[in-house]
Regions:
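Long, hydrophobic alpha-helical segments that serve as membrane-spanning/inserting helices
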Residues: 1-15, 36-232
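Hydrophobic membrane-insertion alpha-helices, especially the h-region
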Residues: 18-33
Length: 232
């Protein structure tokens, strides 16, 4: 009788203990679930904020790239006028304009505010869309450096080769103390070394414009992915 009573008490205690453990376990599980849910939601908000800034940066980059490509066409057109015009009379009236364009170089500085913020805060891993993440990283670690490197090549050749050779015959920058007639400038442009430097510089500018065009396409592609993600 006593033994049966003890078994009953043990069973009751065990069931109560098991129930309490189960309640605690369920409570902890629910707590973890809501904590994870809140954390995921907070992370999604962080990513959304980053992408909103990134979108603004990409729009600015697109406009900047379009402007630089347009400028590049004008620079190459001026070099073509200087190197391929058969008549001196065609150049005399516009020689200063074309020299100024030929002595210019292409440049592009990407707005990397969002990229730097994401990189410094180590939030790249919060981007769940793998395609977007890959495009984002490729854009800033490969596409942009490739574009800026070619801009630097164009700048270096223009500043260290073309302008110094031009400066032997006339001032590239307007200088009231060193006045050279348009006829003399045209004559200098016809000289073999300067003409060859202009042609080489035109080649660098064309390749740089190709890099700018490639970057523009990549920018638009990334911008579309960002817009798609923000619409979710």
């Amino acid at each position: 009788m006593e033994e049966r009573k003890n078994k009953h008490l043990f069973r009751v205690a065990f069931e109560r203990y098991t129930s309490e453990i189960l309640v605690i376990f369920i409570g902890i599980s629910i707590s973890f679930f809501f904590d994870e849910w809140r954390e995921n939601r907070a992370n999604d908000e962080i990513v959304k904020e980053h992408l909103t800034v990134l979108r603004t940066n990409l729009v600015q980059d697109t406009l900047n790239l379009a402007f630089q490509i347009d400028q590049g066409n004008k620079l190459v057109d001026s070099i073509n006028k200087l190197t391929y015009s058969e008549s001196d009379a065609q150049l005399i009236d516009s020689i200063d304009y074309h020299i100024d364009k030929a002595a210019s170089y292409l440049t592009f500085t990407s707005n990397q505010m969002a990229y730097e913020e994401i990189r410094q805060t180590a939030h790249t891993g919060l981007i769940k869309n793998d395609t977007l993440k890959t495009s984002f990283l490729t854009y800033y670690t490969a596409v942009i450096p490739y574009c800026t490197e070619w801009c630097k090549i164009d700048e270096t050749h223009t500043m260290t080769q073309l302008i110094p050779e031009m400066s032997i015959y006339f001032s590239v920058i307007a200088d009231s103390l060193n006045i050279v007639s348009s006829q003399e400038k045209v004559k200098a442009i016809r000289m073999k070394k300067l003409r060859n430097l202009l042609l080489v510089n035109s080649g660098f500018k064309k390749v740089t414009m190709g890099a700018l065009a490639l970057t523009k396409r990549a920018t638009i592609n990334l911008l579309k992915k960002v817009d798609d993600e923000l619409r979710k």
